[in-house]
Amino acid sequence: MNSKVVIYTDGACAGNPGPGGWGALLKFNDASKEIFGYELDTTNNRMEITAAFEALKILKKSCNVEIYTDSKYLQQGITAWIHNWIKNNWCKSNNEPVKNADLWQKLYAELSKHTIIWKWVKGHANNSGNIAADKLAVQGRETAIEVLKCRG
């Protein structure tokens, strides 16, 4: 029987593009794990996708996963749009390349390892898991800003 894991993800960016961070809260039974990271020059959408990918990547065995995101871009991209993107060789219906295809492909590769339900949650609306993921993403973003300051 697969274990159940609940994941909350978020991304944050100072400017778009600009320094950004991603964060995720993973809950399993009574345990939880917080992860975050950053990129020096990125977009909010890239950070949203990265948060989900990094959270799934650390799961060591097949799990039943509920992923909560406040990003409609992430939720709709991975549950609806991606099927046509794959069919159209990572192009949209207007033949333009899909933005962030590199990250969508990495995230898609993780999907087959788990049974996943994607859920949208309103951001900044008193959802404790979303608030925790947001704080982690902001921590990542602030780390990126500090790294840039140190580089002058």
From Swiss-Prot:
Residues involved in Mg(2+) 1 binding:
10, 48, 70
Q: Does the keyword tRNA-binding apply?
A: no
Documented EC number(s):
3.1.26.4
**Which cofactor is essential here?**
Mg(2+)
Q: Which UniProt keywords apply?
A: Cytoplasm, Endonuclease, Hydrolase, Magnesium, Metal-binding, Nuclease
Q: Which residues bind Mg(2+) 2?
A: 10, 134
The record's InterPro entries line, in alphabetical order, gives:
RNase_H, RNaseH-like_sf, RNaseH_domain, RNaseH_sf, RNaseHI
Q: What CDD domains does the record point to? A: RNase_HI_prokaryote_like (cd09278)
Which PROSITE patterns does the entry mention?
RNASE_H_1
A Pfam family this protein belongs to? RNase_H
One Gene Ontology biological process: DNA replication, removal of RNA primer
Entry note: cofactor:
Binds 1 Mg(2+) ion per subunit. May bind a second metal ion at a regulatory site, or after substrate binding.
Carries keyword tRNA-binding?
Answer: no
The RNase H type-1 domain extends over 1-142
Q: Name one GO cellular component term.
A: cytoplasm
Q: What Gene Ontology terms describe what this protein does at the molecular function level?
A: magnesium ion binding; nucleic acid binding; RNA-DNA hybrid ribonuclease activity
Class of this enzyme: hydrolase
Localization, per the record, is: Cytoplasm
* Reaction(s) catalysed (UniProt annotation): Endonucleolytic cleavage to 5'-phosphomonoester
**Function recorded in the entry:** Endonuclease that specifically degrades the RNA of RNA-DNA hybrids.
> Quaternary state and partners of this protein?
Monomer.
Query: What is the similarity comment for this entry?
Result: Belongs to the RNase H family.
Q: What is the protein's name according to its record? A: Ribonuclease H
